[in-house]
């Protein structure tokens, strides 16, 4: 039986372990923390004598493929929910929202009426779906993506526009209104301050919609997203995966295929036939000798997150009939302002450059899944904080 060692017990490491142990491998996970979960873990707060759990990192579920959700066994343990109501978008000094309907024909009418959009919204959605199906096929069949495969499956025009092109060119191709471009291009900078003028940034837009667990939409997990990794950990342990927590890796010897790590009882060495790093990109470059000393990567970013608690269910001034809807507040009115704010945060010329706030109504979603909690919850995800500072160092 071949031995596989996985470094990291976030959702990617846990999913890999699940498939590999069921394929007949001897699988060991090494995790430096005292718990599994990676970014999908919980924190707790006691308010007025009542304890409430909330997501420490990731909050919403959306990018997981449905086949992974089913084949790992998670679908038997997890209750999920995604809003069928329209997303709601606000711009500065506007009290009434624009509704982002899931039906593209309704959306086309709404954007034309509210934002003066004269572009090709249906074409955008249809072409995006072609790219999404291509991405999902790569996932399902475990195909390494190449430009040749993209050109063969999608054709040169779609590939150049949606995969290799810039977000700016993609948005200009389909939309006439800056507000439409801002909303559709918002995901380009969610994970980092990428420039909309950089080649390849167009691909982020369909990628962020490529999960199939909720049919391409984003939603919530009953109790909290940490139930994904908690349940998957338990499933894996029952399948025979070994998980070593509180383990500090000292060295990786790729010649002898040995990994050395310290635990409470001292240093342990583990032989492997295959080694998988299910971590951030920095970890392998630090642990593997002469991996690539020229690579310099950062652990900082430009995103911020606030979890707000309320004694009573929230009542919205606008569209209160849609309590489960995601809401988006934009501080920018044009792609030019959007780009400047994102890039200024990268240049570290200030602590905060307003971009947008995404509001996740976690408390309302929990109620929709019959999970009654002591307080209502809103999660506010915001851009753009200074790139080189951590939260504690920002000017409050």
Predicted regions and their residues:
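Helical element adjacent to the flavin cofactor pocket in flavoenzyme catalytic cores
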Residues: 207-251, 255
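Mid-domain catalytic core of redox enzymes
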Residues: 250-371
